[in-house]
Structure formats: C-alpha cells, structure tokens
Design a protein with these regions (language model features):
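Class I S-adenosyl-L-methionine
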Residues: 113-128, 138, 142-333
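Extracellular structured ligand-interaction cores
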Residues: 25-28, 78, 241-243, 335-337
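Short hydrophobic-aromatic micro-motifs
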Residues: 132, 245-248, 338-342
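Generic structural motif
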Residues: 86, 251-253, 343-345
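Helix N-cap/coil-helix junction residues
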Residues: 100, 219-220, 342
Length: 355
C-alpha cells in the first residue's frame, strides 16, 4: 500500500511485525470505532515521539532523531464498526498496513448489529478476548447541551422529532453504552474497556448508573472497577484531554489471588489495570518525565510543499483572528494543546493551527 506519511514511508510492515512462534494473538472487538484511535493504541506499531516513550523496550526502531516506531502488540482487531463512512475509510487506510481485511469494519450502528445477531445472524466473531468502545460522548460533554440519557439523537445519527412525540429510548445516542453491554453479553470477553468524556463524571448519577449496568453483563460475571479519569498529559501526549475509563474483567477468567485483589477497596498496584503516570503533568513527582509539549511534536514538521502527506499539502487559507469567537484559539508551543472541537456551528471553515 502507498504510504502517505512522511515518517512511515518505505517501511516493510510484514517483515517488522510478526508474533513470536507459538504466541497467540489477543482478539479485539471494537465498537464505535471511528477512525481507530483506541484500536491503534492496542495494536501498536505506530510512530511516537521519543520523549513520549517511557520504556525503551517498546521501541521497534528509530524513524529519525525524534520519532520512534513502536513495536506491535499481541492485540489484533477482528471486528470494528461505526456509522460514518469517512471514519471507515480512514480506519481502513491506516490498518491495511497490517494486512487487516476490510470486511472487519462494519458500516453499521451497534443497535442494528445486535438486532441482527438476535435474529439469528452470526454478526459478531467468536473467541473474543477484549471488547472496546468509546461510546458517544456528545450528550455528556461539557462542550455540549448535556442531555445525558435524554439524548435528542438516535443511534444512527438522526435527530429525534420532539414535536412528533418521539421520546428517549434505549436506542438514543445517550444510551448506546447499553448496546455495548449487550455485545459483552453475547461474546463474553475476558476484558472490556469503555471510554467517555470527563463531563460524564459530573452529570448526576450517570457514572454510577453506567458502572452498575456494566457490572450486570453476563449475569454479573464482571468486576467493573471504579472508573478513573485519565489525563493525556500524564502519559506523554501534549494534550489537555481528560477521559473517564471503565474497565470490566471477567471473574471466571481470574485466578483466586487476582479476584481477591480486584475486589479490595484499594486495588494493589500489581493488579491495578489503570496505568500509572509516566510524565509529570497534573501529577507532581520528580521521578516522572517532564510533560511533552507541542513544540516537541510540531518542531520538525516539514513545510507543506516538502511533505508527502496530503493532509499537510492541502489546507485552508483562513487566518487566525484574535476576537474570541469559536475556533479562534492559539496553540501554546511550550504547553499542551486544548481538545479540538469535532463540530462547529455557523458559517466558518477549517484553518491551519496557529501557534
């Protein structure tokens, strides 16, 4: 496949990424897959700034003085889905370097997929080890209207017609985590990971309700640990992004020692699946690496005319205006980038980042 990345061009992925002899891949079922952020994190084999890497054993090879190619992990995505065609195209364009079959990605709502499975179709794969899902966040986000479970949007992206008497249901966007729970009921993975925005934590009892509902999966056979809010800056990513993570582990897949440890009020570090901070952003510890900044990441970007990356070559001529309106934010090179909004309102257009 033609490589459109300045860093990754010319790499022979088939030769680089091979499982050790006798090593079994861990099969991942991905829901709400989008363009593959969570999937890529599990798969590995991506480019990463050297300052973001806290363990040299994770490095496959240097790409240049600043950027490293990480080793591929044992995780293999065997199922992915989303309702956005552009997301599927992006996912396939990237994942094809690993030889993943395009049929793995289903352009369907999780609601429709679960319904087809209930009708007798073999929709979901067997022997799934991990289920992941960043269930839709718009109804919980501080940047949105915070409708929560009372979402005005259906599972397929269509807006409910309030004036027509439509009422919220299990199929509205704010309740799609329940359909993720149904997938867990069906495939019974050893582990599941669900992700959403930090704003969910402060929206009434939403966090507690979601944790309780996930705990009921497969007849209560899952320990769902207390959700934690993780800050990207504490893990070598130059963003202020904060996300709440739910982790559920199948009781029957655990050793007695691990089960007892995970059921304790304070889970011992040796058994805690939540990662410890590697960089000192919001965590103050002199033993941690300094935060990675935007200057570290953007400092060696080639000029558009010198890049083979089409996304770098083509850009809007719109200019930064220091007037406080939406989208008028500068990136602080010696700090962390804010979360870039995924939607906008009004007659505006995309522009290059200002730093």
């Amino acid at each position: 496949a033609e490589e459109c990345s300045d860093l990754m061009k010319g790499l022979q992925y088939e030769a680089l990424f091979k499982l050790e002899e006798g090593e079994r891949p861990l099969r991942v079922l991905s829901l709400f897959s989008g363009c593959g952020g969570m999937d890529l994190g599990l798969e590995g084999g991506f480019a990463c700034h050297a300052r973001s890497v806290s363990n040299s054993e994770w490095i496959q090879q240097p790409l240049n003085a600043q950027w490293m190619l990480l080793k591929r992990n044992r995780f293999r995505t065997v199922f992915a889905c989303d309702i956005l065609p552009a997301a599927r195209l992006t996912w396939l364009r990237y994942m094809r370097r690993f030889g993943i079959d395009p049929s793995v990605y289903h352009l369907d709502s999780v609601v429709d997929l679960v319904k087809r499975q209930a009708e007798g179709q073999a929709v979901f794969p067997s022997e799934v080890d991990v289920v992941t899902g960043g269930f839709p966040c718009q109804d919980f986000s501080l940047a949105g209207k915070r409708k929560g479970f009372d979402s005005a949007v259906s599972h397929n992206g269509e807006r409910r017609k309030a004036d027509a008497g439509d009422i919220p249901s299990e199929e509205t966007r704010g309740k799609l985590y329940m359909w993720m729970k149904q997938v867990i009921d069906i495939v019974r993975p050893k582990l599941f990971i669900a992700e959403n925005v930090k704003g969910l934590v402060s929206l009434g009892d939403v966090k507690r309700i979601i944790q309780r509902d996930f705990s009921a999966a497969n007849g209560g056979d899952y320990i769902v640990l207390d959700p934690q809010v993780l800050h990207a800056g504490n893990y070598g990513v130059p963003e202020t992004r904060e996300r709440v993570i739910f982790i559920g582990i199948k009781r029957s897949a655990l050793t007695p020692e691990a089960l007892a440890a995970l059921e304790r009020e304070q889970v011992p570090a040796a058994f805690n699946p939540y990662p410890a901070a590697t960089h000192g952003c919001t965590v103050r510890d002199p033993r941690l690496a300094r935060p990675v900044t935007c200057r570290d990441i953007f400092g060696d970007l080639p000029e558009p005319a010198e890049s083979v990356d089409l996304a770098q070559q083509n850009f809007s001529g719109a200019k930064y205006m220091d007037n406080g309106t939406q989208g008028q934010t500068e990136i602080l090179l010696d700090g962390l980038a804010p979360t870039i909004r995924s939607e906008h309102h009004g007659n505006i257009e995309f522009r290059r980042l200002s730093a």
